[in-house]
A protein has these predicted regions:
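Bimodal "functional hotspot" detector
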Residues: 1-183
């Protein structure tokens, strides 16, 4: 016989098997022209059993919410493994990643949408790509994946937020300042 169980017989772990976490993600998708990436913010709840790097990649695969943006990953692309070690994220994808490289976005756009999304959310400095465990591959017939990729700010399309704010202020002043006749 074991005897009566006391409080010290149990593990006090506030994070359980079916617990969820919340994250505000910075994701990058292709512009419709396919030559730049555009930032999209997304709030997600995800299982504590799933790593943040997998959540970021799943959200990239789900595509953008904004209809003025285009996705960078197809449904056929699978993440075989993803690891973070010493400020480097190593991402191993299946062969479909190379097979679907002939999309509308430039190869650099697809790669840096993934790199910038992973760097911004995970705090890593670089991303090393692998396809079926091999880094010595070429993406889109022109981009070697042999070396690690660092975050690239030059490829980000800066949206003119100031113009949107100015237009909103002008429309609001017209609504408030001009009495409309015939209502």
């Amino acid at each position: 016989p074991i005897g009566a169980m006391t409080r010290s017989n149990f593990i006090n772990n506030p994070v359980g098997i079916n617990s969820y976490q919340y994250a505000s993600l910075v994701l990058y998708f292709s512009s419709l022209s396919g030559d730049k990436i555009v930032k999209e913010m997304r709030n997600v709840h995800y299982s504590t059993n799933t790593t943040l790097e997998k959540v970021v990649l799943e959200q990239l695969a789900a595509g953008p919410v904004n209809s003025k943006l285009s996705g960078v990953l197809t449904e056929e692309v699978r993440v075989l493994d993803v690891k973070v070690s010493e400020k480097t994220c190593t991402l191993n994808l299946n062969q479909a990643f190379l097979d679907t490289a002939a999309g509308t976005a430039a190869p650099e756009v697809v790669i840096y949408a993934m790199v910038n999304s992973l760097c911004d959310n995970l705090g890593v400095d670089k991303v090393q790509f692998q396809v079926e465990g091999t880094s010595d591959v070429v993406y889109g017939d022109s981009l070697s994946l042999a070396g690690p990729f660092h975050r690239n700010s030059d490829i980000i399309e800066i949206q003119e937020i100031q113009e949107q704010v100015t237009e909103a202020a002008e429309s609001e002043s017209q609504e408030l300042g001009e009495p409309q006749i015939g209502l």
